[in-house]
Amino acid sequence: MSLNHDDSQDAPQPKAKGKIATRRVARSLAMQALYQWHMAGQSLNEIEAQFRVDNDFSGVDGAYFHELLNGVARKKTEVDQAIAPNLDRPLDELDPVELAILRLSTYELMQRIDVPYRVVINEGIELAKVYGATDGHKFVNGVLDKLAPSLRSAEVRNHKR
């Protein structure tokens, strides 16, 4: 699925009710913005401003959207270094949508310990089901399942008890 900016307007956005839903929409929009950043090479400020104009942000956790978009970009090298050992191919050979989802989810695993790791993984899978290739969600699930124990070792250990 090609995901340029015009496609993002056609993609269904979940209706937001409460903190969980507004963050889900923020993740979806942040993933699309990260995809655009990767593909078009526009500045983050331009992309963020464009997304805020082109999308209804009334049901979006705007601060979370901003943090995810800018945080992934700021920590891109660190995020990519965490992802790379868990892949079966180089980062530059990944589907760009799946790469955007993995970067977003990895950033959350690394920086947002207030969000349970299972939530991060499930949200990444859901994004891949909506925007990724046919079996993209399985790939995203596999990579995030490998990543979680190294980034959230105590939480994963406690969950498995």
Curated annotation (Swiss-Prot):
One of its GO terms (molecular function) is RNA binding. Residues 1-20 are annotated as: Disordered. Keywords: RNA-binding, Transcription, Transcription antitermination, Transcription regulation. The keyword RNA-binding applies. SUPFAM superfamilies: NusB-like (SSF48013). Transmembrane segments: none annotated. InterPro entries: NusB-like_sf (IPR035926), NusB_fam (IPR011605), NusB_RsmB_TIM44 (IPR006027). The lineage of its organism: Bacteria, Pseudomonadati, Pseudomonadota, Gammaproteobacteria, Pseudomonadales. The keyword Transcription applies. Involved in transcription antitermination. Required for transcription of ribosomal RNA (rRNA) genes. Binds specifically to the boxA antiterminator sequence of the ribosomal RNA (rrn) operons. Belongs to the NusB family. This is Transcription antitermination protein NusB. GO terms for biological process: DNA-templated transcription termination; transcription antitermination. GO terms for cellular component: cytosol. CDD domains: Terminator_NusB.
